[in-house]
Amino acid sequence: MMTGVDDTATMLTGRVVTPERVLDDGAVLVEGDRISWVGRRADLDDRSAERPDDWAEGRTILPGLVDVHCHGGAGGEFGADPDAGRTAAMHHLRHGTTSLVGSLVSAPAPSLVAGVAACAELVAAGVLAGIHLEGPFLSVARCGAQDPTTLVDPDPSLVDALLTAAHGGLVQMTFAPERSGAAELVDQLATARAIPAVGHTDCDAVVARSALDRVLERGPRAGRPLVTHVFNGMPPLHHRSPGPVAAALGSAARGEAVLEVVGDSEHLAPETVRMLFETVGPDGLALITDAMAASGMPEGRFRLGGREVVVEGRTARLADGGAIAGGVATLIDVVRWCVTEVGVPLHDAVNAASRTPAAVMGWADVGALEPGRRADLLVVDDGYEPVRVLRAGAWVT
């Protein structure tokens, strides 16, 4: 039984999603900026049981969500304009993403360095949890919405400039392992504690597995490789030419790689997402949004890294060519779709949107409703719509 509750503590009761289970009649105690207790409401002492915040009763309490791949939202894009980045980050925070990595697409070197420097300001201010570079060392054949004219082989001097501009904030970088110099890039990034993530690649299974093994050996952050939005930006799985998907699935099934999954109803079919949860499991999957500036905005025309994007319904596509150009969802939208449309158990979907991405980044302070962790949580209604968001013990909404 829990005892000794501070009179200034916040107590929430409802359905609570912990790392291990869903407590149908649970409680979360927040003291200051920390979670101090999580458990069954029946285990509260008499004094504490009389003090819950009644508005949360009957609702579901989730850990603050963790999105490690997001390009923007609310009309703002992560890049050289820090104000636009703040706008995007606040949009996702209000929808329950309490730890957000800002992603930048490929661009000419000066623009990329400037964008990283601006995002580093947001990391220093606590607005972003880190920076992700999706390029420019990618495959032209699998560039997706990336500008193919900006894609180049790994350049150690450019990487040094980007790392310098990031001031320690670079947490992952997507690369195509078939590019000349890719092995050296893995070593350079790992030394800087940035995770090399395999993606936007046209390589075969052998090359992909070798790259994932090299990242595993170098062990940046928590020691696990990442695969950028698995299935998207790479050859499809074929029984005689398995490609990087086979290597990614095998590595994740062994408990090694973590696979990013854009579960937004547009990037992957429901059966594909269900297969990933059933074969790999939530410990090897990180649900992401891959959201761009159009997230939270009406249909219309937007830009992604300088390229024009047309948004109709839930789909963002390049105006020129029609390639999918990121997503328009928030991470709670992704969780909702996985649970209500795909049939993923709530516990698994939430872990893949919080605990697993936090773990792969080595962030022991966030990602779960556990005593001692930062008090980040999201309260949702029966339709998994956000009701209130708490970050570091302070209500955001």
Locate the predicted segments by residue.
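Divalent metal-dependent hydrolysis catalytic cores, especially in the metallo-beta-lactamase
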Residues: 71, 86-115, 127-139, 166-178, ...
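His/Asp/Glu-enriched, well-ordered alpha-helical/loop segment
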Residues: 240-259, 277-289, 294-380
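Short, small-residue-enriched loops and turns at beta-alpha junctions
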Residues: 74-76, 108-109, 140, 146-149, ...
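Active-site mouth loops of central-metabolism enzymes
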Residues: 71-82, 145-152, 197
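Histidine/acidic residue-rich metal-binding segments in metalloenzymes
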Residues: 152-259, 266-285, 304-305
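Divalent metal-coordination and catalytic microenvironments
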Residues: 14, 28, 33, 58, ...
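N-terminal metal-binding scaffold of metallo-dependent hydrolase/deaminase domains
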Residues: 1-47, 394
